């Protein structure tokens, strides 16, 4: 039996089937902040699946909240057991999206948000029905400025991420929606409107 979710955007409580939304962006584009804002406003309707990674936690990151931090052996063990819906090796680090994590959220009747890299989002889009959203900084210069505020990353890591961002931005046309994060408040309203439009489409067939 399918579990439905009551739309937080509809005054008459129209219900629809929960759906998987993927949100991707170059490092520094602001995807984490935007997703946090969405969860804060609509905690009963949306839940973010927690990705697994073999990188070390950054200052302020919490295991099980921001990421499931694993050793390489632990990650490969889950991989061998076919526990990831998608995974990628990027910048010397493994990242993966848990099958169980997504399934658990959808079965609770909540929309699932997966904050994953571009390659992972496009992989999921081929495997199942998703709404793929790409967050983009207004310019490469602004992206570089935001990355330079991250004390947790070394210069080489920042350079690699900037170079990789060109590949990610080139793939933006393959996503269902592109949101330019020039102003955080405006970008959030655009993101919010995407969820409203998708819920309306799902509830009205």
Curated annotation (Swiss-Prot):
Q: What residues does the Guanylate kinase-like domain cover? A: 18-196
Q: Please list which residues make up the signal peptide.
A: none
What broad class of enzyme is this?
A: transferase
> Which species does this protein come from?
Chlamydia muridarum (strain MoPn / Nigg)
Instruction: Please give the PANTHER family that the UniProt record associates with this protein.
Output: GUANYLATE KINASE, GUANYLATE KINASE-RELATED
Tell me the disulfide pairings in this chain.
none
- The protein's name in its UniProt record: Guanylate kinase
Q: Where in the cell is it found?
A: Cytoplasm
Checking PROSITE patterns in the record gives: GUANYLATE_KINASE_1, GUANYLATE_KINASE_2
> HAMAP family attached here?
Guanylate_kinase (MF_00328)
């Amino acid at each position: 039996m399918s579990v439905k979710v009551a739309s937080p955007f509809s005054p008459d409580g129209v219900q629809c089937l929960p759906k998987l939304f993927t949100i991707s962006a170059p490092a520094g584009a602001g995807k984490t902040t935007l997703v946090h804002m969405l969860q804060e406003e609509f905690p009963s309707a949306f839940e973010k699946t927690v990705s697994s990674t073999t990188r070390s936690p950054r200052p302020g990151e919490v295991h099980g909240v921001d990421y499931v931090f694993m050793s390489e052996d632990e990650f490969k063990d889950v991989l061998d057991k076919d526990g990831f819906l998608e995974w990628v090796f990027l910048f010397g680090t493994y990242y993966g999206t848990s099958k169980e994590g997504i399934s658990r959220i959808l079965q609770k009747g909540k929309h699932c948000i997966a904050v994953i890299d571009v390659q992972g989002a496009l992989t999921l889009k081929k495997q199942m029905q998703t709404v793929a959203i790409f967050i983009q900084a207004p310019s490469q210069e602004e992206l570089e400025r935001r990355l330079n505020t991250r004390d947790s990353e070394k210069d080489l890591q920042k350079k690699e991420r900037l170079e990789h961002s060109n590949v990610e931005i080139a793939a933006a046309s393959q996503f269902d929606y592109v949101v330019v994060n020039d102003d955080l408040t405006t970008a959030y309203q655009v993101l919010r409107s995407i969820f409203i439009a998708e819920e309306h489409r799902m509830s009205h067939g």
